[in-house]
Amino acid sequence: MTSRNQLVQKVLQELQEAVECEGLEGLIGASLEAKQVLSSFTLPTCREGGPGLQVLEVDSVALSLYPEDAPRNMLPLVCKGEGSLLFEAASMLLWGDAGLSLELRARTVVEMLLHRHYYLQGMIDSKVMLQAVRYSLCSEESPEMTSLPPATLEAIFDADVKASCFPSSFSNVWHLYALASVLQRNIYSIYPMRNLKIRPYFNRVIRPRRCDHVPSTLHIMWAGQPLTSHFFRHQYFAPVVGLEEVEAEGAPGVAPALPALAPLSSPAKTLELLNREPGLSYSHLCERYSVTKSTFYRWRRQSQEHRQKVAARFSAKHFLQDSFHRGGVVPLQQFLQRFPEISRSTYYAWKHELLGSGTCPALPPREVLGMEELEKLPEEQVAEEELECSALAVSSPGMVLMQRAKLYLEHCISLNTLVPYRCFKRRFPGISRSTYYNWRRKALRRNPSFKPAPALSAAGTPQLASVGEGAVIPWKSEAEEGAGNATGEDPPAPGELLPLRMPLSRWQRRLRRAARRQVLSGHLPFCRFRLRYPSLSPSAFWVWKSLARGWPRGLSKLQVPVPTLGKGGQEAEEKQEKEAGRDVTAVMAPPVGASSEDVEGGPSREGALQEGATAQGQPHSGPLLSQPVVAAAGGRDGRMLVMDMIATTKFKAQAKLFLQKRFQSKSFPSYKEFSALFPLTARSTYYMWKRALYDGLTLVDG
């Protein structure tokens, strides 16, 4: 039967042969086979009590470099072998000797090959690790190392992986990360108090990629040749063990080296004193401890920041867990507003940890109260929803809330009611804006007959305010006078005149009437017309402007005849509106259906023609209506119409040319910048031109 050592030797030999192949394909294939071989047996359980019963030797060089902020009562030991001794140090810490160093090396190579993307990009500490790799090539921070591109780092990673297949190779930072994942333990990377600019990237706790239990911690130190009092060159790794564990073993080889720890114990307690007594000053410590002033203040700053960061992280994580147990994870923006000191990567790491734990609590009372959101739904839909939610409640209570929110939005759209996001968020605060718009878009696709009907109230809405007062007053006067003349009763209540839902065509007709009345009154310039009524055609403004000269001059703007629409008059006006929509040159005559009693100031020729047409119940004929328009077009208004059309065309050409030049110079403006230069251009037009440019089209030739 093949022994464990022989299998490991065979695996390493196959990996070494695959290194000779070009690229990583052959090495990855060999690592897949090696994983199957190594998975047939697991790493032995580490023996309790630390190192075995053997003569241990304290590493004097590493001991002289042992930093003051590292864990106390620990000793770096001598480890024999070749290369950087990383795997020998880990084997010695776990099993007392370096017998399993080759197996750890093989498992680490397989881990780095099969999870290459994770260690280069997918890990939370990827940026820190890659920066440490840059600085591991030198002893000081330099611009050349800082600006190494990712492709160079990937090449260094591939070269290190290939070199790791041979026992005498040197290890780097990502070997520590991969080794932590192989051992399923944390690795405390102890870095000397040298190379201070790059030290934070190396002196840290390295956690495994995935761990199903609370991991223990191994202490491994970076050791090497001291260059000056501020610099050293890394050469190997040294295992660090606890002093009490070594004394419990009774190892005789440690006794001569124990006095060497005495001079280090006093200065090392400075940071612990600062953590216990934040108000401690430097004057109380400079006589007792050999600590410089800069080191003291750096430690005091670190201790204060440490306490603040620990408290903030604890409260932030507890808040996120509490929100998850209540039925949904708090969105990122809301979380960062509450805890700005927590990074995005930490938030997503905690979120994935909560979602991947698989431990969802029972449905809290808050979720039961969520059924009040669906109290207006039909009973059949609620029954179906209960069946779906009962199946989802077992997996995640957050899914129940999302299902209820989605059903609520779909039901509102099926009733031709569009709930704004701010109102939707009040009911379902855990749903993000993007999720809301995705659901709304899908629901609108399933309801093609949906028409966005603006809800009107007696107090008025923002839509009416944007249209102007003229959009409300003429319509209200029309309705009141029409009802009063027809029935002789009091005008109806405002609630009856303003229904909650209005068809889109009716709303557009009233908007057009309001615009026409303001143009006919002569107090609405063309620029304000374009801003107030962007959905109406500019030609309609000039047609109404020319018709304004046909009104009786004896009437003021408050004495404009208000129509009393009968059934035949309404039909005639609807046909007239449709005819004007088909032909932009058609004339929008004054309101039809006005009787001779309503207009007592001497009706004009056009008013008489309208009365004749209304009496017969038929719309106006084209030739009769075209005569005043032609006459007006030949005068001053006609010239203004032509000039305005030329100016509008030139204005659009300038806007297109501006966007095209900015697109070619790769500095495309935002809509805010564009609207400041071209305020009369609609937002949809801007995005239409932008999409055309990005699709490769040309807006302006030449």
From Swiss-Prot:
One Gene Ontology cellular component: nucleus
Annotated S-S bridges: none
Record flagged with keyword Aminoacyl-tRNA synthetase: no
Broad class of where this protein is predominantly found: nucleus
Molecular function, one GO term: sequence-specific DNA binding
Keyword Transcription: yes
SUPFAM superfamilies: TrpR-like (SSF48295)
Biased composition (Basic and acidic residues): 570-582
Alphabetically ordered keywords of this record: Developmental protein, DNA-binding, Nucleus, Transcription, Transcription regulation
Alphabetical GO biological process terms: regulation of transcription by RNA polymerase II
Listed InterPro entries: Trp_repressor/repl_initiator (IPR010921), Vertnin-like (IPR038822), VRTN_OTU_dom (IPR047273)
Annotated region described as Disordered, given as residue ranges: 562-625
Locations listed in the record: Nucleus
Family affiliation: Belongs to the vertnin family.
Biological function: Acts as a transcription factor that regulates development of thoracic vertebrae.
Protein's recorded name: Vertnin
Species, as recorded: Homo sapiens (Human)
